Amino acid sequence: MATTWLVTVSLPLAFVVTTLMVTLHSSVQHEVLHGHPFANRHLNEALVFLPLGMVFPYGRFRDTHLEHHRDEHLTDPYDDPESNYLDPKVWAGLSWARRRLLRANNALLGRMLFGPALSVWRFARADAAAIRAGDRAILRDWLLHFAGLVPVVWWVWQAPMPGWAYAIAAYAGFSLLKVRTFLQHRAHDLARGRPVIVEGQGL
Protein backbone atom coordinates (compact mmCIF):
# COMPACT_ATOMS: atom_id res chain seq x y z
CA MET A 1 0.00 0.00 0.00
CA ALA A 2 2.83 2.42 0.85
CA THR A 3 4.51 1.92 -2.52
CA THR A 4 1.28 2.07 -4.54
CA TRP A 5 -1.55 4.12 -3.02
CA LEU A 6 0.03 6.08 -0.17
CA VAL A 7 2.83 7.42 -2.35
CA THR A 8 0.25 9.15 -4.55
CA VAL A 9 -0.93 11.03 -1.45
CA SER A 10 2.44 11.86 0.11
CA LEU A 11 5.90 10.59 -0.82
CA PRO A 12 7.40 11.47 2.61
CA LEU A 13 4.61 9.60 4.41
CA ALA A 14 4.98 6.63 2.06
CA PHE A 15 8.73 6.68 2.71
CA VAL A 16 8.21 6.55 6.49
CA VAL A 17 5.69 3.70 6.26
CA THR A 18 7.92 1.75 3.86
CA THR A 19 10.87 2.18 6.24
CA LEU A 20 8.81 0.86 9.14
CA MET A 21 7.55 -2.08 7.09
CA VAL A 22 11.07 -3.05 6.04
CA THR A 23 12.12 -2.88 9.70
CA LEU A 24 9.12 -4.97 10.75
CA HIS A 25 9.87 -7.54 8.03
CA SER A 26 13.45 -7.86 9.31
CA SER A 27 12.15 -8.27 12.86
CA VAL A 28 9.80 -11.03 11.69
CA GLN A 29 12.77 -12.71 9.99
CA HIS A 30 14.50 -12.68 13.36
CA GLU A 31 11.53 -14.38 15.01
CA VAL A 32 11.31 -16.93 12.19
CA LEU A 33 14.93 -18.04 12.54
CA HIS A 34 14.23 -18.67 16.23
CA GLY A 35 11.32 -20.95 15.32
CA HIS A 36 8.30 -18.65 15.44
CA PRO A 37 5.39 -18.35 14.84
CA PHE A 38 4.73 -21.89 13.53
CA ALA A 39 6.25 -25.25 14.37
CA ASN A 40 6.95 -25.88 10.67
CA ARG A 41 10.24 -24.29 9.58
CA HIS A 42 9.33 -24.19 5.89
CA LEU A 43 6.04 -22.46 6.60
CA ASN A 44 7.84 -19.91 8.76
CA GLU A 45 10.45 -19.20 6.12
CA ALA A 46 7.80 -18.84 3.42
CA LEU A 47 6.53 -15.83 5.38
CA VAL A 48 9.82 -13.96 4.98
CA PHE A 49 11.24 -15.38 1.74
CA LEU A 50 10.91 -12.18 -0.28
CA PRO A 51 13.86 -9.90 0.61
CA LEU A 52 12.04 -6.61 1.20
CA GLY A 53 15.24 -5.17 2.69
CA MET A 54 17.00 -6.18 -0.54
CA VAL A 55 20.48 -6.76 0.89
CA PHE A 56 20.85 -9.87 3.05
CA PRO A 57 19.91 -13.42 2.03
CA TYR A 58 17.62 -14.83 4.72
CA GLY A 59 19.55 -18.11 4.84
CA ARG A 60 22.78 -16.31 5.57
CA PHE A 61 21.15 -14.11 8.20
CA ARG A 62 19.73 -17.25 9.83
CA ASP A 63 23.02 -19.13 9.90
CA THR A 64 25.23 -16.24 11.03
CA HIS A 65 22.76 -15.03 13.65
CA LEU A 66 22.42 -18.48 15.19
CA GLU A 67 26.22 -18.68 15.28
CA HIS A 68 26.22 -15.27 16.97
CA HIS A 69 24.00 -16.71 19.71
CA ARG A 70 26.66 -19.18 20.81
CA ASP A 71 27.49 -17.56 24.13
CA GLU A 72 31.11 -18.61 24.20
CA HIS A 73 31.68 -16.72 20.92
CA LEU A 74 29.67 -13.60 21.76
CA THR A 75 31.51 -10.37 20.75
CA ASP A 76 34.63 -12.34 19.72
CA PRO A 77 36.07 -10.48 16.70
CA TYR A 78 36.91 -13.76 14.97
CA ASP A 79 34.14 -16.16 15.99
CA ASP A 80 31.09 -13.88 16.33
CA PRO A 81 29.91 -12.90 12.81
CA GLU A 82 27.99 -9.93 14.25
CA SER A 83 30.78 -8.56 16.43
CA ASN A 84 31.71 -4.88 16.19
CA TYR A 85 34.97 -5.49 18.03
CA LEU A 86 38.44 -5.85 16.49
CA ASP A 87 41.62 -7.58 17.52
CA PRO A 88 43.98 -4.87 18.88
CA LYS A 89 46.60 -5.97 16.36
CA VAL A 90 44.11 -5.54 13.51
CA TRP A 91 43.09 -2.13 14.86
CA ALA A 92 46.73 -1.03 15.01
CA GLY A 93 47.13 -1.80 11.32
CA LEU A 94 44.16 0.26 10.15
CA SER A 95 44.49 3.61 8.42
CA TRP A 96 43.59 6.84 10.22
CA ALA A 97 40.46 7.26 8.08
CA ARG A 98 39.28 3.72 8.77
CA ARG A 99 39.76 4.19 12.50
CA ARG A 100 37.76 7.42 12.43
CA LEU A 101 34.95 5.67 10.57
CA LEU A 102 34.85 2.79 13.05
CA ARG A 103 34.95 5.19 16.00
CA ALA A 104 31.97 7.00 14.49
CA ASN A 105 30.26 3.63 14.12
CA ASN A 106 30.57 3.18 17.89
CA ALA A 107 28.25 6.15 18.52
CA LEU A 108 24.50 5.70 18.05
CA LEU A 109 24.18 8.27 15.25
CA GLY A 110 27.21 6.84 13.48
CA ARG A 111 25.84 3.31 13.86
CA MET A 112 22.61 4.41 12.18
CA LEU A 113 24.35 6.35 9.39
CA PHE A 114 27.33 4.13 8.64
CA GLY A 115 26.47 0.84 10.35
CA PRO A 116 24.28 -0.59 7.56
CA ALA A 117 26.89 0.10 4.87
CA LEU A 118 29.72 -1.29 7.01
CA SER A 119 27.72 -4.43 7.79
CA VAL A 120 26.84 -5.00 4.14
CA TRP A 121 30.45 -4.51 3.03
CA ARG A 122 31.88 -6.87 5.66
CA PHE A 123 29.16 -9.47 5.11
CA ALA A 124 29.39 -9.45 1.30
CA ARG A 125 33.18 -9.55 1.30
CA ALA A 126 33.28 -12.56 3.65
CA ASP A 127 30.62 -14.42 1.67
CA ALA A 128 32.31 -13.68 -1.65
CA ALA A 129 35.54 -15.16 -0.29
CA ALA A 130 33.67 -18.24 0.97
CA ILE A 131 31.97 -18.74 -2.40
CA ARG A 132 35.31 -18.46 -4.22
CA ALA A 133 36.65 -21.09 -1.81
CA GLY A 134 33.86 -23.44 -2.87
CA ASP A 135 31.17 -23.05 -0.19
CA ARG A 136 28.10 -24.27 -2.07
CA ALA A 137 25.67 -23.65 0.82
CA ILE A 138 26.47 -19.94 0.86
CA LEU A 139 26.22 -19.80 -2.93
CA ARG A 140 22.80 -21.47 -2.73
CA ASP A 141 21.57 -18.91 -0.21
CA TRP A 142 22.65 -16.04 -2.46
CA LEU A 143 21.03 -17.60 -5.53
CA LEU A 144 17.77 -17.98 -3.58
CA HIS A 145 18.14 -14.37 -2.50
CA PHE A 146 18.52 -13.18 -6.08
CA ALA A 147 15.50 -15.25 -7.09
CA GLY A 148 13.48 -13.57 -4.34
CA LEU A 149 14.70 -10.17 -5.46
CA VAL A 150 13.10 -10.59 -8.89
CA PRO A 151 9.48 -10.05 -7.75
CA VAL A 152 10.55 -7.33 -5.29
CA VAL A 153 12.39 -5.36 -7.97
CA TRP A 154 9.52 -5.92 -10.42
CA TRP A 155 7.04 -4.58 -7.87
CA VAL A 156 9.15 -1.51 -7.12
CA TRP A 157 9.76 -0.95 -10.85
CA GLN A 158 6.06 -0.76 -11.69
CA ALA A 159 4.97 0.97 -8.46
CA PRO A 160 4.45 4.75 -8.29
CA MET A 161 7.12 5.04 -5.58
CA PRO A 162 10.50 5.94 -7.15
CA GLY A 163 13.11 3.21 -6.95
CA TRP A 164 15.57 5.54 -5.22
CA ALA A 165 13.00 6.25 -2.49
CA TYR A 166 12.47 2.53 -1.87
CA ALA A 167 16.22 1.91 -1.75
CA ILE A 168 16.72 4.69 0.80
CA ALA A 169 13.76 3.39 2.82
CA ALA A 170 15.35 -0.07 2.86
CA TYR A 171 18.59 1.48 4.16
CA ALA A 172 16.66 3.49 6.74
CA GLY A 173 14.91 0.32 7.89
CA PHE A 174 18.30 -1.28 8.48
CA SER A 175 19.35 1.86 10.37
CA LEU A 176 16.41 1.48 12.74
CA LEU A 177 17.44 -2.11 13.42
CA LYS A 178 20.87 -0.82 14.40
CA VAL A 179 19.27 1.08 17.29
CA ARG A 180 18.09 -2.21 18.82
CA THR A 181 21.46 -3.89 18.45
CA PHE A 182 23.55 -0.87 19.46
CA LEU A 183 23.81 -1.74 23.17
CA GLN A 184 22.90 -5.40 22.94
CA HIS A 185 26.31 -6.79 23.87
CA ARG A 186 29.53 -5.60 25.46
CA ALA A 187 33.10 -6.81 25.70
CA HIS A 188 33.81 -8.86 28.82
CA ASP A 189 36.34 -11.53 29.78
CA LEU A 190 33.56 -13.91 30.82
CA ALA A 191 30.87 -15.00 28.35
CA ARG A 192 28.12 -14.52 30.94
CA GLY A 193 29.06 -10.84 31.24
CA ARG A 194 28.65 -10.05 27.54
CA PRO A 195 24.85 -9.94 27.07
CA VAL A 196 23.29 -6.63 28.09
CA ILE A 197 19.93 -6.72 29.90
CA VAL A 198 17.96 -3.49 29.62
CA GLU A 199 15.57 -3.28 32.55
CA GLY A 200 12.85 -0.82 31.61
CA GLN A 201 9.78 -0.23 29.51
CA GLY A 202 8.74 2.01 26.65
CA LEU A 203 11.20 3.98 24.55
Labelled PLM ranges:
Residues 35-49:
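Membrane-interface motifs of alpha-helical transmembrane segments
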Residues 43-44, 82, 108, 158, ...:
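Residues in and immediately flanking transmembrane alpha helices
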Residues 38-39, 62, 92, 198:
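Generic, ordered loop/turn and secondary-structure boundary motif
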Residues 166-203:
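Extended hydrophobic/aromatic segments used for targeting, binding, or gating
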Residues 26-35, 61-73, 180-189, 203:
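Histidine-centered catalytic micro-motifs
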Residues 39-41, 87-89, 125-128, 188-193:
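Short alpha-helical linear motifs
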Residues 1-24, 28, 51-167:
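Non-catalytic, topology-defining segments of multipass membrane proteins
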